[in-house]
């Protein structure tokens, strides 16, 4: 009676290493026992019972927090939590159907369940629910993360076990980056997309057609078509400030990985406001959460739902974001404007908010991160000018990731140009700027792009060096900022190399001869340039003068074997990028017949034949690369136009002059 009285007015709570008997103070228990003047043996029995209660509480705290898949039985009922509108977490019912063993890979199980409540009867499983926690008897089972079928009459979902979410994302949150395939230089929009597509090439957990599967582990209850329908819940993309055409290349790549653009998310104001009404309070399981890829004057990211918060550790989604492993994406709050019902794919219309932490792991069964200050991002500043219009400035922050950063910068810059300048018709962009790198020299940008869609080329020229830098296999590189100044004009500022000649009657070693170059501008006018060419004293009897544009010079250098040996250091890589041939230059090369070599990224022209023979024998060991011709002199002339064309002159030093 005495013990039952204490039990009736109290409740035992436990936390790791702590026992709390609510409603009864220890002094009260002591006074009750001593005041009752119990015999010694009775006192021992009561103490033993209390001790057993305490030990029982201690033994169940760690294991009772999460429910193992081994405990799951068909017919169990639970409750899920998510936000259908605003920031209010609402409950929905969960009815367990069964367990699919090894469905998502070896020792990667999925729990099948029917969900109901709120708008689910008319929406089915909703894009944006990924990560919604499911509890059975107060214990966390996992995250709603997969949907079954399209045009389904019932909301049937797959639940990723919480233990697998924690297991997949447990480990160091920082490691040496994995080398990915960098985009080519020079590059195009298609080149950026191809590099991104090749680097990801996701291995989907479920087949894309019924011909690829015949059995799913449902004990014959369903045929092979089940596997084509069981997929991760689509992840809503939030895009504010973007034109649909400008965002299309990156959108196609994300859609292939299971993302879906929220209606009105591009080219409209939905999601543009990143501030939500009133304070949102601390992050909770069931709250919407965002992964921000671009913030600032543009906004681009994705949203899901928080599954679990353990201290400052956050688990969400229940399936991958893009399954890129270690990440440094900003974690943000999110706001649900409403749910758009659809027989094909219902979706939460969301916007991303303030940064509350860092997404550090993107794995097959979850994304996870840490609450606190957000990660370092790449700051992009753009100043856009055109005659007759005021100067415009744009600033946005881009997620720092070897794979995504070049693609995001390209998309943001192209979108900015297409939104504020003409998208079609003749135009010219004069681009100057720099990419600042921590602890290294800047990468300089100086190009002119003219034609019907120069914005594509301008954006690609900025993104290309980023892909090379971030994916180099020499040493890590941190991009700090990108500062750009762009002058726009609605005229095609182009020029062609029309003529080139040496204005001298005799060409002898030791003399300087004038090289004349005529450019024919887009208006039909001629522009004359003069370059003094000193002839070396030890020059061959016959020399070659190459007058060319930047792209053709790069092609010639490739044929001559000059890029065969890559730089050994990040500094060497930056020097190589700064030596990239520009399309607003006239390049002149004086070439001799005696070749040279490239050693440790340095060009050595005019080497003796004996040295070249030794180097050729050592070429297989990576000792260097031979050159077919020796460069005896190099000049470049900067112009205010995009230059194209090439002229080659053969110079004879015996007094006969030149042969075009």
Predicted regions and their residues:
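Small side chains
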Residues: 5, 57-59
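Alpha-helical transmembrane segments and their juxtamembrane interfaces
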Residues: 23, 54-55, 86
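N-terminal secretory signal peptides that target proteins for export/translocation
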Residues: 1-43
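Alpha-helical protein-protein interaction elements
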Residues: 19, 32-35, 48, 214, ...
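Bacterial N-terminal signal peptides
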Residues: 48-57
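Generic intrinsically disordered, low-complexity segments enriched for polar/acidic and small residues
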Residues: 37-40, 53, 63
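Terminal presequence/propeptide segments associated with secretion/organelle targeting
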Residues: 59-660
């Amino acid at each position: 009676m005495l013990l039952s009285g204490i039990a009736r007015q109290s409740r035992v709570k436990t936390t790791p290493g702590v026992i709390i008997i609510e409603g009864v103070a220890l002094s009260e228990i002591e006074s009750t026992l001593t005041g009752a003047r119990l015999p010694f043996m009775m006192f021992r029995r009561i103490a033993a019972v209390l001790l057993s209660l305490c030990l029982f509480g201690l033994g169940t705290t760690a294991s009772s927090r999460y429910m193992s898949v081994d405990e799951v039985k068909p017919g169990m009922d639970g409750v899920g939590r998510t936000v259908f509108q605003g920031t209010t977490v609402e409950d929905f019912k969960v009815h367990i159907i069964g367990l699919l063993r090894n469905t998502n890979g070896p020792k990667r199980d999925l729990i099948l369940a029917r969900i109901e409540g709120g708008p689910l009867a008319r929406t089915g499983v909703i894009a944006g629910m990924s990560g919604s926690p499911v509890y059975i008897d107060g214990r966390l089972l996992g995250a709603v993360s997969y949907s079954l079928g399209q045009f389904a009459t019932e909301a049937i979902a797959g639940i990723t076990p919480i233990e697998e979410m924690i297991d997949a994302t447990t480990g160091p949150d920082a490691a040496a980056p994995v080398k990915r395939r960098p985009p080519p230089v020079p590059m195009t929009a298609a080149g950026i997309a191809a590099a991104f597509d090749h680097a990801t090439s996701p291995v989907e957990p479920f087949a894309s057609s019924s011909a690829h599967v015949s059995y799913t582990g449902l004990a014959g209850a369903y045929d092979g078509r089940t596997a084509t329908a069981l997929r991760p819940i689509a992840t809503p993309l939030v895009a504010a400030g973007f034109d649909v055409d400008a965002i299309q290349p990156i959108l196609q790549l994300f859609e292939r990985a299971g993302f879906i653009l929220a209606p009105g998310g591009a080219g409209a104001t939905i999601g543009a406001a990143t501030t939500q009404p009133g304070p949102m309070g601390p992050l909770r399981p069931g709250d919407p959460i965002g992964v921000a890829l671009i913030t600032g004057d543009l906004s681009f990211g994705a949203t899901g739902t928080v599954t679990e918060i353990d201290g400052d550790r956050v688990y969400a989604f229940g399936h991958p974001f893009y399954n890129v492993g270690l990440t440094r994406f900003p974690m943000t709050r999110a706001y649900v404007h409403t749910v758009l019902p659809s027989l094909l794919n219902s979706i939460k219309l969301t916007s991303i908010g303030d940064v509350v932490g860092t997404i550090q792991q993107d794995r097959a069964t979850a994304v996870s991160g840490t609450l606190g200050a957000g990660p370092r991002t790449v700051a992009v500043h753009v100043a856009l000018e055109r005659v007759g219009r005021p100067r415009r400035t744009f600033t946005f922050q881009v997620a720092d990731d070897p794979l995504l950063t070049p693609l995001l910068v390209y998309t943001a810059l192209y979108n900015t140009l297409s939104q504020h300048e003409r998208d079609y018709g003749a135009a010219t962009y004069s681009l100057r700027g720099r990419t600042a790198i921590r602890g290294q020299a800047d990468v300089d940008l100086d190009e002119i792009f003219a034609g019907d869609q120069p914005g594509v080329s301008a954006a690609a020229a900025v993104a290309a060096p980023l892909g090379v830098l971030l994916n180099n296999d020499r040493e890590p590189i941190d991009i700090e900022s990108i500062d750009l100044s762009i002058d726009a004009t609605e005229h095609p500022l182009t020029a062609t190399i029309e003529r080139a000649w040496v204005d001298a009657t005799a060409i002898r070693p030791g003399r300087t001869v004038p090289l004349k170059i005529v450019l024919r501008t887009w208006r039909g006018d001629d522009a004359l340039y003069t370059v003094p060419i000193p002839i070396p004293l030890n020059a061959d009897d016959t020399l070659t003068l190459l007058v060319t544009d930047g792209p053709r010079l790069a092609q010639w250098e490739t044929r001559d074997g000059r890029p065969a040996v890559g730089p050994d250091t990040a500094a060497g890589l930056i020097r190589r990028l700064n030596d990239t041939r520009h399309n607003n230059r006239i390049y002149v090369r004086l070439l001799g017949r005696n070749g040279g070599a490239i050693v440790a990224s340095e060009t050595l022209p005019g080497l003796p034949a004996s040295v070249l023979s030794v180097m050729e024998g050592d070429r297989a060991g990576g000792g260097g690369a031979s050159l077919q011709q020796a460069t005896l002199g190099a000049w470049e002339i900067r112009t205010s136009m995009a230059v194209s064309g090439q002229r080659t002159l053969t110079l004879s030093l015996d007094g006969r002059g030149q042969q075009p």
